[in-house]
Design a protein with these regions (language model features):
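Helix-to-loop junction immediately C-terminal to a conserved catalytic motif
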Residues: 63
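Conserved ABC transporter NBD signature motif
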Residues: 71-79, 86-87
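Conserved ABC ATPase "signature" region
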Residues: 113, 127-145
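Conserved ABC ATPase signature
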Residues: 149-153
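Conserved catalytic motifs of ABC-family nucleotide-binding domains
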Residues: 170
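Catalytic Walker B motif of ABC-type/P-loop ATPase nucleotide-binding domains
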Residues: 174-177
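H-loop/switch region of ABC-family ATPase nucleotide-binding domains
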Residues: 210-211
Length: 237
């Protein structure tokens, strides 16, 4: 597949799928089939397709949550799943299933702080860590919710909290699975037209999954269309 841009010397693709097929346990039919895809750094890629087309499976395979049966996956230059733990520390991920139960005891800032806790036990974040949490809350526009119990928030507010958690470590790669599903129009437009383009300018790579084929964030450099577990079309810009 033709890349969006030529890589500079010593650069690596943010995402590489080389003939990848992934199966769910006990299933005879692959969830994704013979996927070939390269995503350059500092770009915004939109992956679209109907429900069940393999979009979420693609992200789960990339993060090593599912192991491919065939092919090779590289995440930020690291082999998946062998070196995925190293690569994950440089990634932010907003899953499709983000809702917290009403009885969830943690506050918004504690939930966001968990995004920094991969290398240290939760509760031992230092002053600089909490400043990073505050910055992420401000970035998404939910600093006023910092001390609220997350379980008492609306679905849209919780989705913003989980987006802030994905951003708190200033990731090199941000993976978003249906990030607008619970948001109102104003929030959608802010993220799509202001937040995501600013992340790209700062050197982040964004990969966003959506079933809404009519929606395209500002600055999108590549649209990948999936159907029945296969990539059926790739459009540049």
């Amino acid at each position: 597949m033709k890349p969006v841009q030529e890589l500079e010397k010593n650069e690596v693709y943010a995402v590489e799928f080389q003939g990848v097929s992934t199966y769910y346990f006990g299933e005879a039919k692959p969830a994704i089939t013979n996927v070939w895809l390269k995503i350059p750094p500092k770009s915004l890629t939109l992956i679209v397709g109907p429900n069940g087309s393999g979009k979420t499976t693609l992200l789960e395979t990339l993060l090593g949550l599912l192991k491919p049966k065939f092919g090779r996956v590289k995440l930020l230059g690291y082999d998946v799943p062998e070196q995925v733990n190293v690569a994950r520390r440089m990634c932010g991920y907003l899953p499709q299933d983000f809702m917290r139960p009403p009885g969830e005891p943690f506050s918004v800032k504690e939930i966001v702080g968990m995004g920094l806790a991969s290398n240290k036990p939760f509760g031992k974040l230092n002053e600089n860590d909490w400043l990073m949490v505050e910055e992420a809350l401000n970035l998404v526009g939910i600093d006023d919710l910092a001390n609220r119990p997350v379980g008492r928030l609306s679905g849209g507010q919780q989705q913003k909290v989980m987006l802030a958690r994905a951003l708190v470590r200033k990731p090199k790669l941000l993976l978003l699975d249906e990030p607008f599903s619970a948001l109102d129009e104003t929030s959608r437009r802010f993220i799509a037209e202001t937040l995501l383009p600013s992340l790209i300018e700062d050197g982040c790579t964004v990969v966003m999954v959506s079933h809404d084929v009519s929606f395209k964030p500002k600055g999108c450099t590549m649209t990948v269309r999936m159907n029945s577990g296969r990539i059926v079309e790739v459009n540049l810009r």
